Amino acid sequence: TMEFVSMMDRYIEQLPDLIFKPADFVFGSFTAEGEWIMKRFRAYSKYPVRKRLLMVAEDIRDRYETEAVMEAEGAPLRTRTVAKSLGSMLTMKNTLAVYKDFYKRTGNRSMLVMPFKKTLEWADVYPFLYLHSVIEGVKESSLTKHLVVDEMQDYTPVQYAALNRMFPCQKTILGDFGQFINPNHLHSLAD
């Protein structure tokens, strides 16, 4: 439902504070404060969490080199070293942990049914993919210039949300006249 997508979007807005608890990064006499790290992390909000960590790691390395600490210490600071340290500051390490946390925090823990360990039901694929795009990122199709979606009434709002993440191009959505994604809520062109 649209309400479910709205719940996911609200959760995604809170996610930076839930998933990342930065501490000071120390390398020799150099220190990047946790507060500064969080500001950099938030500055890259349009990127997935994993990419943000890498970008912040590069910022820390650049700051280290700029402050000329490298010359005094003599040891080079590698982006990979910083990224690994930042990764350890994540409170949830993968999309499945984030997906479980979403259901826990929204009070819908009983809605998440996992038939086997680390196995989701089909109904969970698109919501999981939607969150995965925020955590790990998804490969966007740059080759697709226009996406045509037929039988629109067979898709749920969360499926459309996930498709929008994967295909950031223009879309044409087709369906039979009088059929709706949610028959209990009519939308106009103004919506």
Regions found by a protein language model. Give the residues of each.
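Conserved helicase NTPase catalytic core signature
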Residues: 2-146, 159-160
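Conserved helicase motor core of SF1/SF2 NTP-dependent helicases
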Residues: 107-112, 132-146, 151-191
